[in-house]
Design a protein with these regions (language model features):
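Conserved small-domain helix->loop->beta segment predominantly found in fold-type I
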Residues: 278-281, 285-287, 292, 296, ...
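Conserved PLP-enzyme active-site core in the AAT-like
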Residues: 2-8, 17-26, 85-317
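PLP-dependent enzyme catalytic core of the Aspartate aminotransferase-like
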Residues: 2-4, 84, 125, 134, ...
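Well-ordered beta-strand positions enriched in small/hydrophobic/aromatic, beta-favoring residues
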Residues: 157, 225-227, 324, 350, ...
């Protein structure tokens, strides 16, 4: 993040998205961020190499850990979210995994909202338990439910700012107060909202994770993920709960992260332990492409928000549509939260159902000509999927209900095309459903 009081620290999101973390290269004067497609970096001398490995001086060792292109991406994302630092990774799933593994180990638990992206639910419900980390699921609509599940081995509370695919809006401020009352950080997946619509740290979140593959990259061409650290959670005040940050790390010559890195202890350990040791490093080329996408984030989101609201209103009045779920609609039960957290916008994901259930949904999807049938979201192109058959296919009926995914749910990720063309495609597909 930029120094407090510097011009960059006063920039709005639109400006940060274009300029954050980079000035023209001092050697070549290149205005575009260079792609440093290298594996390793030369040391000045033996002592310089030793100091780098001891974390005594900043610098690059190996692209698995740091890379100059990726460093610009990390600075830009941290500035957009208002954090102290960021760690870019190979995917959003890697970001979520490392966000937990940085502070949790066998015998620990996390408390998570049950309304989650299907991949995250599977990670929490089935994979983390294989490493001895339990996930306790709470109803996102009841902040007190999170507190009831926290104990002395709880390492984090996890929610999505806007749920995928449900489009539900989390009352982050209320959940943060519950988490902090128990001495536990709040991790928010801000993928669907993006920092353009919501800076989760402003409402009490401590850690933010992103799938950069989605709206920040914005063009469906690069996998990436990120963890952003607010630098505000008092890890050193909770030494017993967060021992890995407050006790010597034998794998790094006994460094104590809270002593060596202060408020950046968490993001520092995320880089030099889970990333260094398990290696989900982002490609410098992907970092470059995602940086290109971020430059147009505000323009794309403005168009996407307008298009999605128009689509939601059109579907809401359609005789072949049973229900529409989009929180930016005035009659949505979470509309007040959209006003509080998202400046009145609902982002680009909406869900709706057809009276004919799964079969009608399949006919609708198969009839689409402009919307692309796939499971990504956040693209400049409009996308459609049937979650129960794809992203949430591994969930049983009870798990689908907890996640808020019904058999008839169709998810749209609306893009930047002309609204009349989008509505025409939906209309002809509905006629065949």
């Amino acid at each position: 993040m930029s120094e407090h009081g510097s011009p960059e620290s006063q920039w709005r999101a639109e400006t940060i998205a274009v300029h954050g973390g980079y000035r023209p290269d001092p050697t070549t004067r290149a205005v575009a961020v260079p792609i440093y497609q290298t594996v390793a970096y030369a040391f000045d001398d033996t002592q310089h190499g030793a100091d780098l490995f001891d974390l005594k001086v900043p610098g690059n060792i190996y692209t698995r850990i740091t890379n100059p292109t990726t460093d610009v991406l990390e600075q830009r994302i941290a500035a957009l979210e208002g954090g102290i630092g960021a760690l870019a990774l190979a995917s959003g799933q890697a970001a979520i995994t490392y966000a937990i593994q940085t502070i949790a180990e066998a015998g620990d638990n996390i408390v998570s909202a049950s309304a989650l992206y299907g991949g995250t639910y599977n990670l929490f419900a089935h994979t983390l338990p294989q490493f001895g980390i339990e996930t306790r699921f709470a109803d996102y609509r009841d902040p007190q439910a999170f507190g009831a599940l926290i104990d002395e081995r709880t390492k984090a509370v996890f929610v999505e700012s806007i749920g995928n695919p449900r489009g539900n809006i989390t009352d982050i401020e209320a959940v943060a107060k519950i988490a902090h009352a128990h001495g536990v950080p709040l991790i928010v997946d801000n993928t669907v909202a993006t920092p353009y619509l919501q800076r989760s740290f402003d409402f009490g979140a401590d850690i933010v994770v992103h799938s950069l593959t989605k709206y920040l990259g914005g063009h469906g061409n690069s996998l990436g993920g990120a963890i952003v650290d607010s630098g505000r959670f008092p890890w050193a005040e909770h030494k017993q709960r967060f021992r890995r940050l407050n006790e010597p790390d034998v794998s790094y010559h006994g460094v104590v992260y809270t002593d060596a890195l202060g408020p950046a202890a968490y993001i520092g350990r995320a880089r030099v332990v889970p990333l260094r040791n398990t290696g989900a490093a982002i490609s410098p080329f992907n970092s470059f492409l995602i940086l290109q996408g971020i430059e147009t984030l505000a323009l794309r989101l403005d168009r996407i928000n307008a298009n999605t609201l128009a689509v939601a209103k059109h579907l809401q009045g359609h005789p072949k549509v049973a229900w529409v779920n989009y929180a930016a609609l005035p009659d949505h039960p979470e509309h007040a939260l959209v006003q509080k957290y998202l400046r009145g916008h609902g982002s680009g994901v909406l869900t709706f159902g057809l009276p004919g259930g799964r079969a009608a949904g399949a006919r609708f999807l198969d009839a689409l000509q402009l919307f692309t049938r796939l499971v990504n979201l956040g693209d400049a192109k409009s996308l459609a999927t049937h979650p129960a058959s794809t992203t949430h296919r591994q969930l049983d009926a009870a798990e689908l209900e907890k996640a808020g995914v019904s058999e008839d749910t169709v998810r749209l990720s609306v893009g930047i095309e002309h609204i009349d063309d989008l509505l025409a495609d939906l209309e002809q597909a509905l006629a065949k459903a």
